[in-house]
Amino acid sequence: MGTPWRKRKGITQVGTMSPAIALAFLPLVVTLLVRYRHYFRLLVGTVLLRSLRDCLSGLRIEERAFSYVLTHALPGDPGHILTTLDHWSSHCEYLSHMGPVKGQILMRLVEEKAPACVLELGTYCGYSTLLIAQALPPGGRLLTVERDPRTAAVAEKLIRLAGFDEHMVELIVGSSEEVIPCLRTQYQLSRADLVLLIHRPRCYLRDLQLLEAHALLPAGATVLADHVLFPGAPRFLQYAKSCGRYRCRLYHTGLPDFPAIKDGIAQLTYAGPG
């Protein structure tokens, strides 16, 4: 009879100690939540709430955003469409888009460089595509690549709603890894004066090296890469700084609607194969 009693006693002691241990860790948990509250809000908004709304509505966030644009934006006015998307992201659901601060950097560079041909890798909902298209010089051409067909369908409708036709903005559905080797033969792109990398940062280095390997970057070409600090593209940045073929500049920004989360855009100027 004694042994079972001791076991029960041991279990009782462990049970009474667990809340005490949890209480001891409470200050640490609170400190971490306060320090990383912006990341926690981002996680809740982009993963938990978004997944719930996807299930309830049967639509993806990009499709819900486009429905909002249809009822609130002026067709044929890309600036008003962009402002409407910004309002949606700030007041309705967070949209993982470039946002107005980074957008101004992008538009200024497109206007300064006046590229004849721009290649965008990562169309997403079409936000940055509209930024580039409205800043292109007369006769300029934009090829934008999106790997997800459903997202690409939304972007296509947004681009056409803004008033840009297929001759000015061509959307290609496929992964950057598959599309880049085919650009010269299938899409008559012999050079990209400006390239925007705005999809998975872990793929940026691969994409850059593919562009080099297929001789699609002329000397003086500009390569812009978003999200190089968050979530980050350290291998891409290290390569660009150490290979000797690029001049690098980093624009420090925050995430749209989360300015406390630090991010940045890298601007590379290609010097040539060397």
UniProtKB/Swiss-Prot annotation:
Q: What is its EC number?
A: 2.1.1.6
In terms of domain of life, where is this protein from? Eukaryota
Give GO terms for biological process: catecholamine catabolic process; developmental process; dopamine metabolic process; methylation; sensory perception of sound
* Coiled coil ranges: none
CDD domains cross-referenced by the UniProt entry: AdoMet_MTases
- Catalytic activity of the protein: a catechol + S-adenosyl-L-methionine = a guaiacol + S-adenosyl-L-homocysteine + H(+)
Question: Which segments cross the bilayer?
Answer: 14-34
Function, as annotated: Catalyzes the O-methylation, and thereby the inactivation, of catecholamine neurotransmitters and catechol hormones. Required for auditory function. Component of the cochlear hair cell's mechanotransduction (MET) machinery. Involved in the assembly of the asymmetric tip-link MET complex. Required for transportation of TMC1 and TMC2 proteins into the mechanically sensitive stereocilia of the hair cells. The function in MET is independent of the enzymatic activity.
* Oligomer status and interactors: Interacts with LHFPL5, PCDH15, TMC1, TMC2 and TMIE. Interacts directly with TMC1. The interaction of TOMT with TMC1 and TMC2 is required for the transportation of TMC1/2 into the stereocilia of hair cells.
Name the chain's protein: Transmembrane O-methyltransferase
Q: Which gene encodes it?
A: TOMT
